Structure formats: structure tokens, C-alpha cells
Amino acid sequence: MSEKKKSAAGILTLLVLCCVLGGCKAGIPVAGTDITRVTVILPHFDDGYWMLIGEGIEQSGEKIKKNCGMDIKILKPQLNYNIPQMVELLKQQIAAKVDVLVVQGNEDEEYIDTLKEAWSEGIQIICVDTDIKNFPEHLYIGTDNYEAGKMLGEELINVTDGEANVAVISGEPGFSNLEERLEGLQDAVKDYPKIHLGDVQYDNYDGLTVMKMYYQNAKDADTIVFLEGTGGVTISSQFRQRDAQYEHILGFDAFYGVISGAIDGIIKQDTRRMGEQVVEEIANYIRNGEYSSETVYTTTHWMTAENY
């Protein structure tokens, strides 16, 4: 073998060895020579949910990111949960030819069509927090929302002794995670005829609307259930102890209200872990050409003042 060929073979062997030792898939060059560009579009930066997902992504596995050549950018719309603005951000990232898009799923037609365009151009799609039903091959990372709703229903039965008139407040129509939670809640209480669930009302993720519904529903309901975090967070900020309007208040993620006693209990989602697993699963794809699973569920648990 000529000296030139020996040199080329040695370089190739060294590159493959570096990839293996660095945790990257053969064929993905070491960090600095080729970058997997990831754009995360979060619908909102808040203090108790999306911010924690963002922190999980930003703070997770710097060694993994470096070894696998991963560059992650986090964006959000100017207005919280503004779908047209998120669609525009998606289009910009498609034009920029990023490798991976991490998004919250929803059922808006233009939003889904834009994601399908990205998918058709070879961009990997990861849904976090909320999945998209019947979407082409993609990854979902987040809560098993049906089971979370069922857990909420079971705890509703426990705290009310199976008898309550319940106001049900959700975020906004068109989000499968909230619909699945509602389904789980309904299934959990269906054999308890003395638990009456009212029609679902939507606060549109707005604290003022939450408070308006809170007082309006107190006329007919003795219990209020929030299917996502806005309601509980709002109640937590308004009341430092239990308010006399309701006998029981249950929700998601608002742990400050649980600590103060303003809320009976919450379903606590592992939001930071959602963010961490985004990074870990992208690394899996870089190394192995596939994710560990099509669906990666994070844990949930029932939190009260007693077990906080």
C-alpha cells in the first residue's frame, strides 16, 4: 500500500474511532465538522411549566450535545400560544433547513400542514407536551394525558367522597392533551352518579378569565377542576390560603397553591425531564438512526401538602 493510501486509511480509522468514543454515530462527524441543528418552538415562557421544559433542554447533557454535534435554538411567539405566529416561525425554520423541529402539538390545520411540509423535506418532528394524532412518523415526549386525567378523577373521588358538583375548566379547544385528560377524568368518575361534571369551559390560558369563571361557577359548583396549569397558577397567586368559594380545588402543576393550602392537590408533571429527554432522544437518533420509542412518557404523580 502506498504511503498516501496508508495515510488516508489511518485518517478514516481515526475518524470512526472518534465517533464511537465520542458517542456519535459513524457517519456523523465529530462535533465542529457537522452540526445537527435543532429548533425548539415553545408556545409560552412562564414560571412553572414551559420555562422548566426549556431549562431541561438547555441544561441537559452538555457532553451529549458536544459529542453529537448538536446545536439547539429555542424560540417562542411574541404572543403566548399564538398559532399564526408559531406557523410563521415554523416556515422560517423550514426555509433555514434545520434538521429537527421540537414543537407542542395542536390541531390547527395550517399548523399541521406546515409541520407536514417540514416532515416531507426530511426534518425530524418531535412533539413535546402535546401529541398530534395521525401525524406521519414522529416522536412524542410528555405525559400520558389520558392516564393523568384518570388519576385526577380518582383523586377527585377521594377528596369528595364520591359526591360533588364540579366545574371543569380547560385551556383551549383543539389540544389533544387536554381532550385526553378530560376523557380520563370522565372515565374515572363514570360509575359515581353523585359526581356531576359540568360542561367544559375554556379560560384560553388567561388569568383574568380564570378568575371570572372561578366566581361565576361558585353559584352552582362546590368543586372546581382545572385540566391544565393556568387555572391553578392563577388561584395560587390570588389566594394564600383556602378561599371559601369552593370546598375542593384540583388542578395541574400549581405546586405553590398546594403548599399554601389554596388547592387540595395537583397532578405534577415532570416538565424538566421532558426537556432533558428531548436532548437524549435526539442523541439516540444521531447515534443509532432511530429513537428509543415512538412515544416517551414522562412520569406524573399526585401532590398534596402532605407529600410535597
Q: What annotation goes with each model-predicted range?
A:
Residues 31, 86, 141-166, 207-211, ...:
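Hydrophobic alpha-helical segments within soluble ligand-binding/sensing domains
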Residues 39-60, 64, 73-87, 104-108, ...:
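Extracytoplasmic "Venus flytrap"
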Residues 109-147, 165, 253-264:
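Flexible loop/hinge segments that line or gate small-molecule binding clefts
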Residues 63-79, 165-168, 189-205:
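Short beta-strand elements in bilobed, periplasmic/extracellular small-molecule ligand-binding domains
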Residues 91-94, 99-119, 185, 202-257:
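Hydrophobic alpha-helical
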Residues 19-23:
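C-terminal motif of bacterial Sec signal peptides marking the signal peptidase cleavage site
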Residues 13, 25, 34, 169, ...:
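Hinge/cleft segment of the Venus flytrap/periplasmic-binding protein
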Residues 2-11:
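Bacterial N-terminal signal peptides that target proteins for export
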